[in-house]
Amino acid sequence: MERIARSLLVLFFIVFSCLSAQAVEQPTYKNTVMVPQTVQLGQCVKTFNVNFEKLFFLTETAINSNNYNIEEIQSKGGYIVFSVAQYKFLATVYTFGPGNAILKITPCNNIYTFPPMIITNVYRYIEQNQYKKF
């Protein structure tokens, strides 16, 4: 009986020694969602198959639903100024042929090092809702 208990204790010790060593060896990965990265201008421009007015409203709704702070809106000019943390962006909507419009989201300070998920979240929201009726 004592021999079985000792064997189980040794086995228990070996298993926990291996698990703790394995946990130390695993590298820790940084969350890259909100890490600033250099973004190309091509990633900031996207064409949608909706008209100017609908894309403008979808952009405003996307910014609002992502809890970004809207600082200025001009519907006639087709632009929205919004901020996320310390980053400030200009979202501009352009007409591009019949039934098409372009959305361009650029940083206001013209420094293209920011978390790319900020603009990706806006584009993703618009893509998911562009065919819904208002």
Q: Where would I find each of the regions flagged by the language model?
A:
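Bacterial N-terminal signal peptides that target proteins for export
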Residues: M1-L9
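Ser/Thr-rich, low-complexity intrinsically disordered terminal regions
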Residues: Q22-F134
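Short, intrinsically disordered, low-complexity terminal segments
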Residues: E2, C18-A21
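Bacterial N-terminal signal peptides
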Residues: L8-C18
